[in-house]
Design a protein with these regions (language model features):
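Alpha/beta enzyme core
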Residues: 1-148, 154-170
């Protein structure tokens, strides 16, 4: 849409997908967006129906809110904010979560939102990329639900190096 508004709408039903022979359904939720509450409810209902039919569910699980940028730092890929989005995603029955690789941490404290504890940042995580990805996995029921990290905008010449880094971290 233009202008960009972080919203996804259902283009078909789970039953239609099932009748066409699909074995899985997917959806996107933009956690933090103005539409996220509606998206969570709609996707939860769709995923419940998919599981009734024996289908797998995949959720593109992204954070989107202008308030997630603070003092020149973009926390949209913060391990704690994306981890919370992942947790909400698996709670509404996503079998697989697609998430961007975390690039920083401390989004909750930076934007002064949510409840957290200093130990999360001082003792339970580090700023190492593998540790940040582990934090995301922990928020997917300690890895019982699948997590795929990939994506992001193309940067041209460094795309291959970034793909190798993501594969190594995963």
């Amino acid at each position: 849409t233009y202008p960009n508004k972080f919203d996804q709408i259902m283009f078909g039903s789970v039953d239609e997908a099932w009748n066409l022979g699909a074995t899985a359904v997917g959806a996107t939720i933009y956690f933090g967006s103005e539409e996220s509450s509606r998206q969570i409810v709609e996707v939860a209902q769709a995923f419940e129906r998919a599981h009734e039919l024996g289908m797998a569910t995949i959720l593109w699980c992204y954070t989107r809110n202008n308030g997630f940028k603070k003092d020149g730092v973009d926390y949209h890929t913060s391990a704690d904010l994306t981890g919370q989005a992942n947790h909400l995603g698996v709670t509404i029955q996503a079998d697989i979560i697609k998430q961007k690789l975390p690039t920083n941490n401390g989004g909750y404290t930076a934007i002064n939102f949510g409840k957290t504890h200093k130990k999360v940042y001082d003792e339970l995580t580090t700023n190492h990329p593998i540790d940040l990805a582990r934090y995301q996995v922990a928020n997917c029921y300690m890895g019982r639900m699948g997590l795929i990290n990939s994506g992001g905008e193309s940067k041209g010449a460094s795309d291959m190096a970034e793909a190798v880094t993501i594969a190594d971290i995963n």
